């Protein structure tokens, strides 16, 4: 802080650069991570990246009933949703510390600027 309670611009820039690097690292970790979700007691499993991109769907042959494709469709949707929920939790885990430093994701309050 400079006299008068104003933050030092150099400190603000250093903190912003550090947070940017943390954000980039977290985004890279999310892109490389994979999480899975399942439905029907594991009959259908979906794998998504940490950023939510669908990677694969595995269907146990026991789940395939040619006379009841609606149930299989429901299981696939449920498995993908479960995997996406897991990806969102991972995103919160990885990005939470970074967005928390930004004032809980509400602007630039974490930079120490008055009034923010």
From Swiss-Prot:
Extent of Gly residues compositional bias: 101-116
Superkingdom: Bacteria
UniProt GO cellular component terms: bacterial nucleoid; cytosol
Keyword Nucleus: no
Role description: Binds to DNA and alters its conformation. May be involved in regulation of gene expression, nucleoid organization and DNA protection.
Family, similarity comment: Belongs to the YbaB/EbfC family.
Record region (Disordered): 90-116
Record's subunit section: Homodimer.
Subcellular location per the Swiss-Prot or TrEMBL entry: Cytoplasm, Nucleoid
Alphabetical list of Pfam families matching this protein: YbaB_DNA_bd (PF02575)
HAMAP family: DNA_YbaB_EbfC
Protein name, UniProt field: Nucleoid-associated protein SACE_0254
MF-aspect GO terms: DNA binding
Source organism of the structure: Saccharopolyspora erythraea (strain ATCC 11635 / DSM 40517 / JCM 4748 / NBRC 13426 / NCIMB 8594 / NRRL 2338)
Cited InterPro entries: YbaB-like_sf, YbaB/EbfC
UniProt KW keywords: Cytoplasm, DNA-binding
